[in-house]
Amino acid sequence: MKASELREKTAEQLNEQLLGLLRDQFNLRMQKATGQLGQTHLLSQVKRDIARVKTVLNQQAGK
């Protein structure tokens, strides 16, 4: 996911995407805790995506 793609979305769409990413992060953390997570890189990828969405939301709020 690129920041330029996120900037084209509305705040409502970004909030929906943020909630989905937070759910994904929770599920990945639970899989890691139970030893079921084979692709550990997904945790950091989702974490970065969350940061991107939050950054774009803050930029839009500042305008």
Swiss-Prot record:
- Which protein family is it in? Belongs to the universal ribosomal protein uL29 family.
Which residues pair up as cystines? Answer: none
Specify the protein name. Large ribosomal subunit protein uL29
Q: Which GO terms describe its biological process?
A: translation
The family database entries (SUPFAM superfamilies) matched by this protein are listed as: Ribosomal protein L29 (L29p) (SSF46561)
Membrane-crossing segments per the record: none
| Pfam hit, one | Ribosomal_L29
User: Gene that codes for this?
Assistant: rpmC
PANTHER family with a match to the protein in the record: 60S RIBOSOMAL PROTEIN L35/50S RIBOSOMAL PROTEIN L29, LARGE RIBOSOMAL SUBUNIT PROTEIN UL29C
- What are the protein's UniProt keywords? Ribonucleoprotein, Ribosomal protein
